Amino acid sequence: MLRPALVSALALSLALAGCSKTDASAPGEPTRIADTGSSQAASATGEAAVLPAAATSVREVGAPESSLVEMYLKLHQAPELSFKEARTSALLAQELQSLGFEVTTGIGQQWVTDKAMKDIGEVKPGVGGYGVVGVLRNGNGPTVLIRTDMDALPVPEQTGVSYASTVESQTWTGVDSPVMHACGHDVHMTSWLGTARALVAQKSKWKGTLVMIAQPAEEIGLGAQAMLADGLYERFPKPDYNLALHVSADAPSGTVVYSPGYAMANVDSVDIHVKGKGGHGAYPQATRDPILIGAHIVTALQSLVSRNVDPLDSAVVTVGSFKAGAKHNIIPDEAVLLLTVRSYDDDTRQMLLDGITRIAKAEAAAFDAPEPEITIEPDYTPSTYNDPAATTRVIKAIGKKLGTEYVREVNPVMGGEDFSQYARTEDKIPSVLFWVGAVDPAKYAKAKADGMPLPSLHSSLFAPDYERTIQTGIDAMSTAAIELFKD
């Protein structure tokens, strides 16, 4: 999943670069860093929170177990695309079984089969529902679910590392592509396994039921739906809390960043098929030009955010594709606009979708053209909402474990993540997702000092500082789980 930059240039990076004081936050970067024990203070008053003293050194992080390093390298070199995670899921299931979990595989199989038949009319070889659920019971207490995603991306790796992926495969819809773990899911899985090991080793510190799930197809926003539709909450212990982490490509390894409340956005895809009447470019009066109509739609759509969304709320309406015509002197019969729509609040989301429909139809009518065909993709990714109370508990515990100077609050982002689905059932289960910094601290400091961008998630150049990131993920997630088991 694509994530915008999460963290501003911390004093840590400036210290490493030889600077003695911090710069003001750049536009789009975090404007506040709240104390881990009072994450809601700033948002409640609308005032910026007081910045705590920043770290002046790189956090010391112990090396992960050598078997976990080997696991990471194995996963990175053998990435699998969405709904094709057969070997990956089998490996994770085997690891959970060795730890004493009750393990069930193939979660979501029927849903995936039905989806493939509906969308492309067939089930391609190797496509399936590869969800894994592991259950470990440890006396009476809360049930805590910890999720990892498994799928890689159709991206050619260009990192130059010795363990780079050279895998080529087909997407679940049949498109040939190179494959790379360009979004850190290999780190997620390794930290997830390390967390399972840590919690098994520390069973004396918690009571309850631990549910570890490995989810397919996060990158296409469908894996959580598949697992929930296959009875995740009915066939297995229903969680009292859900936890997940994600790497950050713009935070130094050894750190954790988080956003209470809305953390990530609703993600909708909308297609607008503009219908006109084609003809010769020299005689436009005899046509209904869909390119002109489409251009008016693109311009008018911008008023939705600027004049319909509360300035204190956030929303994005982006036209990512405008396709029409094939020759200089031919006015085509149609044009197609492809939109991505981002929001946090459900009411704002609905207002945007209604507004897109209204504007597209009105602009077509103004040109006396046929009504456009508007398709809103039903399988959207809902916004990720971090339960404030659970987030406060989790972050306070992580701050004690890592050191509060290495745990930072950041602004929510407009990226999407289908972990949100687990909190969207009628049970409204409190859920928390936090980010783990994945950039080598020295590289992070140099990039910030030089004003140079870092390789982003989904980039063919993204190569995380994997050992420090994996261990920080283990430390943070196992601490979070033990805290929530205290209920």
Regions found by a protein language model. Name each.
Residues G131, Q170-M180, D186-V187, L199-T318, ...:
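Histidine/acidic-residue-rich, glycine-tolerant segments that coordinate divalent metal ions
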Residues M1-S8:
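Bacterial N-terminal signal peptides that target proteins for export
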